[in-house]
Amino acid sequence: MKDSMFLYEFDLCRYSKDLTALSLGLLIGASLTVRWVSLSMSSSRDLLHYLVLPLILVVILHEGLHALTAKLSGAKTSLGVLTKYGIILAVYVGINTPLPVKKIRYITIAPIIISIVAFFFSWVTYSPFWAILYIFNTTGIVGDLIVFLVLSKMPSDAIVVDEGTIMKSNAEFPEPYPSWFSKLIIGLAVLVFLYILTNIRIEFEVVGTLPNQTMPVNSHFE
């Protein structure tokens, strides 16, 4: 299919503020739904097990599900990395084969399965590991949700090429939601951030070794 057929383009990066605001909302919302799980980290091993490992697994499983569902739909895929100022912001799977919107929708929303499964296991086992995995994936699905909202308003037979952060189509891309909603979520995110900033309390304990003595040193920040 010739590139000249794809006259319309949708760039997810245009919604960077919305992505940040919605990510904060999903992070808080997901955390509140697993309030029965308590997490305590006392070593670097705990940090690796409860934060680093779930984050790595989420990236692999999330993008892997995109790739798997795309392959099952008969598409060729590619792996890409979104960077800014040399910092990796996101990993994404591009769909190089033109597909109808009805198939792209399933590919886009597929990673929600990870959140459902992780939430179930966190509820059954009370495991902080599964809870953190659930929170990370739910927070990271925000871009997929915006894309899905766009696709849900398009004709099912429209053809789309998904390059990861940019989609091209032979049909016009609608806005995912009204402009007032964008302003609302950004405003709420700013208020929530300011509330957290003014009410946060950080506490840590440093154990220092002095001559002939081990002394705990407590530091508190409010």
From Swiss-Prot:
- InterPro entries assigned: DUF3267
Question: What is the name of the protein in this document?
Answer: Uncharacterized 24.7 kDa protein in gap 5'region
| Top-level taxonomy | Archaea, Methanobacteriati, Methanobacteriota, Thermococci, Thermococcales
